[in-house]
C-alpha cells in the first residue's frame, strides 16, 4: 500500500509522498513467450535492466534504432544515416531514404498473405446496424479509390487537408489516402465546434475539409456538415468539402465546392501508386487540445512515425498474429493516430473500432464488444476506468471477458486504486497492465512496462528500450532515487515532434530552451511533466510542471492528493486546487464526484479529509471538500484544473470551447 515517505527534493523542493510497495510479477508463461524475451535471447541479454540500458546507451542506441527501422518498415530507398543532429533541435532521422507509410500499412499486406485478414472490426453505435469487417484487401481498394479521387481534385504532395469525422472506417481510409499521396492530414476531433475546425484549417492552410453529413451519438443523428460549412467560411484556403453520407441527415451542398464521397470515388481505379517521400516529410499536423494556453500545431514526420509506434506496440503489448486489439481512443487524438491507424496496420493486426459512447445503450456496451468479438488486448484511459468504477463492477461482471490477456492505460497518470480496480474487475485479478506515459509531441510511448516487467500500481515503470528518459532538477542534475523533478528526454528518438506549424520561436522556448545553456544538456527535451522515481527506480508521473500546490513551504503534486482521494471507497473522481492562505501560502481544496449509491454529507467530507491525512500526512490534507456531479474535462477526458480553479476563485475561466462538458463549469462552487 502507499506509505508515508515525506521526502523532499532540495532543488525543486517538491515534497514526495508516494512509496508504492505492492508488486505484481508477470506470469512465467507470458514472460517466456513474449516478443521482447525472444529478442533478448537472440541478443544474449540476461536481464531486463541490462537490455533497457544497452538500447538507450550512447554507444548502442542508434544501432538499436537502425535494427528497428529495418525490422518494421519496408524502405523504397534505403537510408544512408540513422540520425543527423547537426541542426539541433531539428533532428533528422533515416537520412537519404524514401518511404510511403500507407504502402507499409496497407499495400504490402494486401498484396501478400494478409489480403483476406481483417484489418478493422467496426461496430456502429446504433445496435440495429450491422458490424462491418474490413480486410486488408478491402482497405487497399477503398484507400486507392479515395486517393485517386483526391488527385482528381488537384491535391498533391505537400498540401494539407483537414479531416473532421467521427469514428467510422472512412476516417482511417481518408488519412491513409492522404498519406499515400504525400498530403499532410490534420484530423480535428468531431466533438469540436465549427470554430475549433476553422481555427485549425485556417492556421495550417488546409485546401480541403473531409467530413460527414452527421453521426450517431447516444442513438440520435447529430449533424456535422453545417460545422464544416461555417469553418470553411472563415478559412480562405479551403477550396473543397468532401462529405461522406453516414447518418442520412439533410445537408446543403454548395455547388462547385462540395462533393459527396460516393460521387468522388465512383469510377475511380482500385490501383494507386504511392508517392515516395523523404522520411522527414510531414505526415500530419495535430493540434493539441491543451489544458492551458492556445492549441499548438504539432508536426510529425513520416519515417519516425512508421518505426516508433509499430515497434512500441509490438513490444509493449506483445501482439501476435491472432490477437484482436482494441484501443478505445478517438482517432482525433495522437493515441488514435499512432495506435488505431498506423502502428496496428503496419504490424498487420486486427483492430476493433467502435463508433459511439461507452455508456450507450448502457454501461455494458464496451464489455459486450469485448465478449462478442473476443478482444484480447484492451488499451483505454484512466478516465474511462474511473467512470466504470463509479458505476460498480456489476456491469463488467455480466459479460465474458476471458478473451482478454493484457490491459493498457493511456492519457494521464492512473491512480493506484483505479489501477487495482482495473486489474481486479476487468483483468480477473491476474492480467498485467501496461501503463504507458507519452504525449502528443512524442508520437509513441516513452515509458512503459514490458510483458516481462514487475508492476507497481500507478507507475509507468521505466523508459522503454531506445528512449533515454530521465528526471532532472532545475540545474540539470539527475535527481536521486526517491526524489522528484522534471521528466526529460536526454536523446532524440524517431517519432518525436519536428516543429510547431508556423511558430519556431515557441517550439524552441517550450521544449528546448530550459536546459539549452546548461553544460552537457544542450538538446535535452523538456516534456513539461513532473515525475518522481522511487527507491527501486520506478517512475511515477505527477502531472504538469505547473500543477503544483505550495503548502507551508512544501510543493505537493495535485495528482498525488487526487490519487489519495480516489482511493477512498466512496469517491470516484477528484480535482484539487490551491486557495490563497495568509499563513500557509495555499490551502488545498478538493472537488469530488462520489461513486454511485453514495450521498454527500458533512461527515463524508470530514472522512475524506481524514483519509488523505492518514494516507499522505497532515500537510497534504485538504481543508475543504466539495461534492460535485461532474468536473470539466477536455475532449480526451483530462480534468481541466485550470478551469476548476478559476471558477472556484471567481476568476474568468477563459476559453472553454474545447471542453467535453462545459455545463460542468457552473456546478463548481465558489470558495472565496
From Swiss-Prot:
One of its GO terms (molecular function) is ATP binding. Mg(2+) binds at residues 566, 568, 571. Its cofactor is Mg(2+). Keywords: Acetylation, ATP-binding, Ligase, Magnesium, Metal-binding, Nucleotide-binding. Its EC number is 6.2.1.1. One of its GO terms (biological process) is acetyl-CoA biosynthetic process from acetate. It catalyses: acetate + ATP + CoA = acetyl-CoA + AMP + diphosphate. It comes from the Archaea. CoA binds at residues 217-220, 335, 613. The modification N6-acetyllysine is found at residue 638. Acetylated. Deacetylation by the SIR2-homolog deacetylase activates the enzyme. The N-terminus is blocked. ATP binds at residues 411-413, 435-440, 529, 544, 555. Transmembrane segments: none annotated. PANTHER family: ACETYL-COENZYME A SYNTHETASE, ACETYL-COENZYME A SYNTHETASE 1. Belongs to the ATP-dependent AMP-binding enzyme family. Catalyzes the conversion of acetate into acetyl-CoA (AcCoA), an essential intermediate at the junction of anabolic and catabolic pathways. AcsA undergoes a two-step reaction. In the first half reaction, AcsA combines acetate with ATP to form acetyl-adenylate (AcAMP) intermediate. In the second half reaction, it can then transfer the acetyl group from AcAMP to the sulfhydryl group of CoA, forming the product AcCoA. This is Acetyl-coenzyme A synthetase. It comes from Methanothrix soehngenii (Methanosaeta concilii). The lineage of its organism: Archaea, Methanobacteriati, Methanobacteriota, Stenosarchaea group, Methanomicrobia.
Amino acid at each position: 500500500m502507499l506509505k508515508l515517505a515525506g521526502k523532499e527534493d532540495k532543488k525543486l523542493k517538491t515534497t514526495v509522498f508516494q512509496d508504492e510497495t505492492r508488486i505484481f510479477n508477470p506470469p512465467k508463461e507470458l514472460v517466456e513467450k513474449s516478443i521482447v524475451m525472444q529478442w533478448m535471447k537472440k541478443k544474449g541479454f540476461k536481464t531486463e535492466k541490462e537490455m533497457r540500458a544497452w538500447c538507450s546507451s550512447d554507444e548502442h542506441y542508434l544501432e538499436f534504432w537502425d535494427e528497428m527501422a529495418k525490422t518494421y518498415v519496408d524502405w523504397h530507398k534505403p537510408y544512408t544515416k540513422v540520425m543527423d543532429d547537426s541542426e539541433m533541435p531539428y533532428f533528422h532521422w533515416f537520412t537519404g531514404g524514401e518511404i510511403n507509410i500507407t504502402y507499409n500499412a496497407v499495400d504490402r499486406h494486401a498484396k501478400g498473405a494478409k489480403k483476406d485478414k481483417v484489418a478493422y472490426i467496426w461496430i456502429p453505435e446504433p445496435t440495429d446496424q450491422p458490424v462491418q469487417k474490413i480486410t486488408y484487401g478491402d482497405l487497399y481498394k477503398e484507400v486507392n479509390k479515395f486517393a485517386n479521387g483526391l488527385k482528381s481534385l488537384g491535391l498533391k504532395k505537400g498540401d494539407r487537408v483537414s479531416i473532421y469525422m467521427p469514428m467510422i472506417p472512412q476516417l482511417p481510409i481518408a488519412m491513409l489516402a492522404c498519406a499515400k499521396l504525400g498530403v499532410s492530414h490534420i484530423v480535428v476531433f468531431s466533438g469540436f465546434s465549427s470554430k475549433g475546425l476553422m481555427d485549425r484549417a485556417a492556421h495550417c492552410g488546409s485546401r480541403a475539409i473531409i467530413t460527414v453529413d452527421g453521426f450517431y451519438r447516444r442513438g440520435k443523428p447529430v449533424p456535422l456538415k453545417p460545422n464544416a460549412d461555417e469553418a470553411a467560411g472563415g478559412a480562405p484556403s479551403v477550396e473543397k468539402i468532401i462529405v461522406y453520407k453516414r447518418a442520412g441527415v439533410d445537408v446543403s451542398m454548395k455547388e462547385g465546392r462540395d462533393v459527396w464521397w460516393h460521387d468522388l470515388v465512383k469510377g475511380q481505379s482500385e490501383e494507386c501508386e504511392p508517392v515516395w517521400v523523404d522520411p522527414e516529410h510531414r505526415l500530419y499536423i495535430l493540434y493539441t487540445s491543451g489544458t492551458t494556453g492556445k492549441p499548438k500545431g504539432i508536426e510529425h514526420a513520416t519515417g519516425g512515425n512508421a518505426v516508433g509506434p509499430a515497434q512500441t506496440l509490438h513490444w509493449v503489448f506483445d501482439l501476435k498474429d491472432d490477437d484482436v486489439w482494441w484501443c478505445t481512443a478517438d482517432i482525433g487524438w495522437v493515441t488514435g493516430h499512432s495506435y488505431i491507424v498506423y502502428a496496428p496496420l503496419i504490424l498487420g493486426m486486427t483492430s476493433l473500432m467502435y463508433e459511439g459512447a461507452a455508456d450507450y445503450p448502457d454501461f455494458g456496451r464496451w464489455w459486450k464488444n469485448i465478449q462478442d468479438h473476443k478482444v484480447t488486448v484492451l488499451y483505454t484511459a484512466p478516465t474511462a476506468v474511473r467512470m466504470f468504477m463509479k458505476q460498480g463492477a456489476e456491469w463488467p461482471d455480466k459479460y465474458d471477458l476471458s478473451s482478454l490477456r493484457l490491459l493498457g492505460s493511456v492519457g494521464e497518470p492512473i491512480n493506484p486504486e483505479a489501477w487495482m480496480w482495473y486489474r481486479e474487475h476487468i483483468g480477473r485479478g491476474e492480467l498485467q497492465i501496461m501503463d504507458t506515459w507519452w504525449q502528443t509531441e512524442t508520437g509513441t510511448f516513452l515509458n512503459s512496462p514490458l510483458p516481462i516487467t514487475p508492476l507497481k500500481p500507478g507507475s509507468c515503470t521505466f523508459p522503454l528500450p531506445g528512449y533515454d528518459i530521465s528526471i532532472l532538477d532545475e540545474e540539470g542534475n539527475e535527481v536521486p532515487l526517491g526524489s522528484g523533478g522534471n521528466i526529460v528526454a536526454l536523446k532524440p528518438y524517431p517519432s518525436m515532434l519536428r516543429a510547431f506549424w508556423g511558430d519556431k520561436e515557441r517550439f524552441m522556448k517550450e521544449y528546448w530552451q530550459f536546459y539549452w545553456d546548461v553544460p552537457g544538456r544542450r538538446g535535452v527535451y523538456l516534456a513539461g511533466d513532473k515525475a518522481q522515481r522511487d527507491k527501486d527506480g520506478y517512475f511515477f508521473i505527477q502531472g504538469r510542471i505547473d500543477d503544483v500546490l505550495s503548502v507551508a513551504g512544501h510543493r505537493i503534486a495535485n495528482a498525488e492528493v487526487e490519487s489519495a482521494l480516489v482511493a477512498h471507497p466512496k469517491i470516484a473522481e477528484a480535482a484539487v486546487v490551491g486557495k490563497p492562505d495568509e499563513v500557509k501560502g495555499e490551502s488545498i481544496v478538493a472537488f469530488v464526484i462520489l461513486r454511485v449509491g453514495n450521498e454527500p454529507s458533512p461527515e463524508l467530507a470530514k472522512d475524506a479529509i481524514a483519509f488523505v491525512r492518514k494516507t499522505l500526512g497532515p500537510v497534504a490534507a485538504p481543508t475543504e471538500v466539495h461534492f460535485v456531479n461532474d468536473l470539466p474535462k477536455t475532449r480526451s477526458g483530462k480534468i481541466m484544473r485550470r478551469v476548476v480553479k478559476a471558477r472556484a476563485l471567481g476568476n474568468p475561466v477563459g476559453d472553454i470551447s474545447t471542453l467535453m462538458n462545459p455545463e460542468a463549469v457552473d456546478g463548481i462552487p465558489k470558495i472565496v
